[in-house]
């Protein structure tokens, strides 16, 4: 396929994928796993990026939704809980008072507010050890001192 044809196909597919993402977001907000699966998997397969832009997930419980390869841009996830998976990307989002207790996640975050994060001894943001460890990264994010200390002790990259 030529580069031009590929570009045209991407332009044609983008609105379809965004409609699917809007329906996926609505299913998550409704805590409706069957609708989530019906809307997601024909359009976006496991291992492919699920991109949410300008969505409000305030107070949502993500417990039954595997979040690997989720991308949140300009989203509100304040007071959400059971966020887990790898990798999860956050850009310019509010993720205040999120409950990560018991979570195991690799997070790539930039320009986000993570103040008030809840965590416990089981919370993991780094897998493995040494040079081969998969580490979460918080770049230019707002963190309270306690959270910053917790993440640093785990070996999370904070800039």
Predicted regions and their residues:
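Acidic, Ala/Val/Gly-enriched low-complexity intrinsically disordered segments
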Residues: 3-5
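Short, positively charged and aromatic/hydrophobic N-terminal segments
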Residues: 7, 12-14
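Tandem repeat scaffolds
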Residues: 22-25, 29-159
């Amino acid at each position: 396929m030529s580069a031009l044809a590929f570009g045209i196909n991407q332009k044609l597919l983008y609105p379809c994928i965004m409609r699917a993402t809007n329906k996926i977001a609505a299913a998550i907000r409704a805590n409706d796993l069957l609708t989530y699966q019906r809307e997601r998997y024909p359009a976006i397969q496991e291992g492919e990026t699920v991109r949410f832009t300008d969505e409000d997930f305030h107070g949502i419980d993500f417990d039954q939704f595997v979040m690997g390869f989720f991308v949140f841009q300009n989203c509100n996830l304040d007071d959400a809980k059971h966020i887990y998976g790898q990798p999860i990307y956050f850009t310019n989002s509010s993720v205040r008072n999120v409950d990560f207790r018991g979570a195991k996640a690799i997070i790539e975050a930039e320009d986000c507010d993570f103040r008030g994060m809840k965590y416990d001894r089981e919370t993991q943001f780094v897998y493995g050890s040494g040079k081969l460890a998969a580490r979460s990264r918080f770049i230019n994010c707002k963190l309270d001192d306690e959270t910053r200390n917790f993440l640093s002790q785990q070996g999370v990259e904070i800039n």
